[in-house]
Amino acid sequence: MRKLALDDDILLEIEKPARYIGGEVNAVMKNVEDIDVRFAMCFPDVYEIGMSHLGIQILYDMFNRREDVWCERVYSPWHDLDKVMREQKIPLFALESQDPIKDFDFLGITIQFEMCYTNILQILDLSQIPLHAKDRTLDDPFVIGGGPCTYNPEPIAEFFDLFYIGEGETAYDELLDAYKEWKGSGKSRREFLERAAQIEGLYVPLFYDAEYNEDGTLKSFTPNNEYAPATVKKQIVMDVTDAPYPMKPVVPFIKVTQDRVVLEIQRGCIRGCRFCQAGMLYRPVRERNVERLKQYAHDMLQNTGHEEISLSSLSSSDYSELKELVTYLIDEFKNKGIDVFLESLNRLNRDKNLHKNVLAFINVPGWVGDPREDLQERLKSKKSFDTPLEVPFITHWLHNMTHDQVLDMLKYLGMGNRPEDKVKVIFVPCYLDGRD
């Protein structure tokens, strides 16, 4: 039985101790003696945010399919635990084994937005890993960055040994195999980085000289090592249908921001908006096979116990098989307590070939604590009320009628319950508890 990195007296003092104990449903456990590479996968934010990230779940599943690799998870501790760890000199640890991150072979950090840059330094500092790549030795893990911010890695380049540019399903196996060959060979850390630099999609900052203009913009960028390419080519998975996908995603112990099954229906976007970073980075558009997605929905619901499905993409309304997929999910799961969340219901509403009327009930917490007394009186009385609320699809008043996430999204999608609309929405903004 594994020993927790934090003592009971610490866990009882901090907020949400379940963030740090691991052992969730579908978390992967392996014997350290049977593996060759230990990889710590980090989302540099609090547990509730990191556990909701699909990219981490995909790589976690892909790595752990290999018998010679054990991929574990690590997130940024909240302020209370951060203070305790510094005071008691407790090194940051992985959730699965509870072992210190500094003892791993790799620390992979996904960099989704610039606001997490300081969290990256927190992760390195708490892990007792030298902040600057040039100061690390053979006793330290290789720190690799991935995610959309790696397309402009220079602001944080000195903290990373290497960056993975692009989608993670293509080149990681080659990197892990190269590490296995290097490990125990007696070669230097630099020699491994030279081998890694030859893998398409990997950028090793040590092997490049960057010069800047007075205004901070990049002036020149040239390799200083014979093994470093002049241009690093981003990685793209052209066949997303056959790419690895987690059929058994880890189920968190506590409520997280995306506490549901997530089906990635496509990558890329046809819109081409110049202000949208994701639209530029994830070109071209690639769709997953609709039959495969149907099977994914069944398997993931069965393996997790989740009661909701979310369809994920940059522009779900542009998925060519959207009507078939949504109709199938509604028909298949309508009597099984499953809600299909979709940001593009208006696609169905605009479909001229849709011959059915769709009635969507949205029962979610609103700004009110429980149903208003006036609504209860209306339900109990025998009077007829013909005066509608100012919003035609809401059942009773919100505390703030000018701003609510659900209401704002429905308005944005153009869902107005007009007579000609095939899709009608009823929004019940109430939190059901023992008082209701």
What are these model-derived regions, one by one?
Residues 47-50, 79-82, 115-117, 150-153, ...:
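Flexible loop/turn segments at secondary-structure boundaries
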Residues 302, 327, 331-334, 339-436:
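Catalytic cores of carbohydrate-active enzymes across secretory and cytosolic contexts
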Residues 237-338, 342:
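Radical SAM [4Fe-4S] cluster-binding motif and immediate context
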